[in-house]
Amino acid sequence: MKVTFEQLKAAFNRVLISRGVDNETADACAEMFARTTESGVYSHGVNRFPRFIQQLENGDIIPDAQPKRITSLGAIEQWDAQRSIGNLTAKKMMDRAIELAADHGIGLVALRNANHWMRGGSYGWQAAEKGYIGICWTNSIAVMPPWGAKECRIGTNPLIVAIPSTPITMVDMSMSMFSYGMLEVNRLAGRQLPVDGGFDDEGNLTKEPGVIEKNRRILPMGYWKGSGMSIVLDMIATLLSDGASVAEVTEDNSDEYGISQIFIAIEVDKLIDGPTRDAKLQRIMDYVTSAERADENQAIRLPGHEFTTLLAENRRNGITVDDSVWAKIQAL
């Protein structure tokens, strides 16, 4: 089915207010969920909203909490989210990293005691729109087996890197082949995954999203490489924030809350003039996309460039929402 941005935001806003969230906070949170969905990231927008409400009702998310600065070391700051709303706090933290970068050339904010930030790419994009390189990542509850294991002991720990090119170039990737959100998107659409995304119950690689969602044997991105990246990203976020690791979140909490996140902004224009920057970025993009295609009908893509097209299509034609997901939201 198709809905408008206004319908989507109104539905989110209604549910948030009915759960006791104040009007201003509800409006800002609903706006972010709707913008994420409008951008084509359904897995971490509309599809994720019922799960967000579940955590709100369980008390994992404290809607009136505000992040608090703990330590300041010039270009580096450490904050405590105090279990505030994840997407609103993440936006504030990237804004703060940008402010630090404006003064120091680079800004790093380490955040502890945070909640799920929904679409991580929003915060990298936020920096790139202002002309900064944006880098951020988060840890999570253990939802992926380390390479060579059957039991979940590491997080998918998504990493975002956004470059202020025209259009913005951005990698937004979990350390698994697919996020659990994308497994859900493919399952709801009745599709197999395009490549193997995990193991079945017999230990064979599989493209069946429902099987992987159930047994939690999701495949690390690049096999042992994604497993290793997940571990070191967790270590850095834990140390810099003085927050909880994947092990602590998993063993000490009843659900995924109190996690650790990193936000970095780099002011490129302190290092290179604008025309030179633009020319170098354009040459990189042209060089990559001019490679001979393996399939003449399949264009060579640059990461993140599809979001400009998706946003325009959704604004023109309406936003696609799965019927069952919309029914869940209407019933909340």
UniProtKB/Swiss-Prot annotation:
Protein source organism: Escherichia coli O1:K1 / APEC
Pfam family, one: Ldh_2
Official protein name in the record: 2,3-diketo-L-gulonate reductase
Residue intervals passing through the bilayer: none
SUPFAM superfamilies, sorted: L-sulfolactate dehydrogenase-like
Name of the gene this protein is made from: dlgD
Principal cellular location given in the protein's record: cytoplasm
Binding site for NAD(+): I168, T169, M170, V171, D172, M173, S174, W224, K225, G304, H305, E306
Tagged with keyword Amino-acid biosynthesis: no
